[in-house]
Amino acid sequence: MFHHVTVLLEETVDQLNIDPNGIYVDCTLGGAGHSLYLVKQLQEGHLISIDQDQTAIDNAHIILKDYLDKVTFVKDNFRNLSDILAHLDIQKVDGILYDLGVSSPQLDVGERGFSYHQEAKLDMRMDQTQTLSAYEVVNTWPYEKLVSIFFRYGEEKFSKQIARKIEAERELKPIETTTELVEIIKAAIPAPARRTGGHPAKRVFQAIRIAVNDELGAFESSIEQAIDSVKPGGRISVITFHSLEDRLCKQVFQEYSKGPDIPRGLPVVPPEYQPKLKKITRKPITSSNEELEHNNRARSAKLRVVEILK
């Protein structure tokens, strides 16, 4: 069983205002920390926990063994949220939570290929049954596409140099391991830049992971479905870990928190002119100093919460 320290555990679930008899969805089961904390608060309620990683689901069966009658596990991508709920014959739920990013077990289990600190085959698939892996991205995607993902998903300012170096190296032989890729990235970045801004491979590894799993596309699709799936008065909690996710989350919530332009002179605002949701957190909630002392991965976490109005 793997060990995972859940970020913003109580804040994320407590912001949902749990109804003991309500139906809730944990779209990112991961290490099952949020699911466990939530399901303990249910009486007649039920929790649907989704993850595309079978390892996470197997692990959660152990962690939640005392609550299995209150949980339905679904192995699927959360971009299919509407279909998942329809298959379970659920019309609306009371709350949904997302904890985006890679769970500690995926980072810590070397063979999954997520970590630039451990040698492993280039993989990075959250769903081990999918075809596209980091190996295909690194060895087959054209230079222009690599530059695009490194810049867009990694905000890497040396995207062109790194992509050019990858292109040159893979012509000699396939790039097969995380260690090989790290050395190529280091060689492509000017020496002064390697000594600042954290690990030199951090941004490229993030970019490849996002591309392999279509993380931003999946989240954008899922959060739109979530907004339509929560009943009025219900809430959605989202933890993001990098600026791309947070920006996307902020934009979607901002869009739905505005109603259409209201004609002047109306004594009351008709329902059709009211926004779909309201923001509970004007500014994102971040980890306390106490949490940061125990979990360095919480440093970049931001929690945004909205309440559905109609």
From Swiss-Prot:
Keywords: Cytoplasm, Methyltransferase, rRNA processing, S-adenosyl-L-methionine, Transferase. It catalyses: cytidine(1402) in 16S rRNA + S-adenosyl-L-methionine = N(4)-methylcytidine(1402) in 16S rRNA + S-adenosyl-L-homocysteine + H(+). GO terms for cellular component: cytoplasm. S-adenosyl-L-methionine binds at residues 32-34, 51, 78, 99, 106. It holds the Pfam family Methyltransf_5. It comes from the Bacteria. It is an enzyme of class 2 (transferase). GO terms for biological process: rRNA base methylation. The keyword S-adenosyl-L-methionine applies. GO terms for molecular function: rRNA (cytosine-N4-)-methyltransferase activity. Its EC number is 2.1.1.199. Its main location: cytoplasm. It is found in: Cytoplasm. Specifically methylates the N4 position of cytidine in position 1402 (C1402) of 16S rRNA. Belongs to the methyltransferase superfamily. RsmH family. This is Ribosomal RNA small subunit methyltransferase H. It comes from Macrococcus caseolyticus (strain JCSC5402) (Macrococcoides caseolyticum). The lineage of its organism: Bacteria, Bacillati, Bacillota, Bacilli, Bacillales.
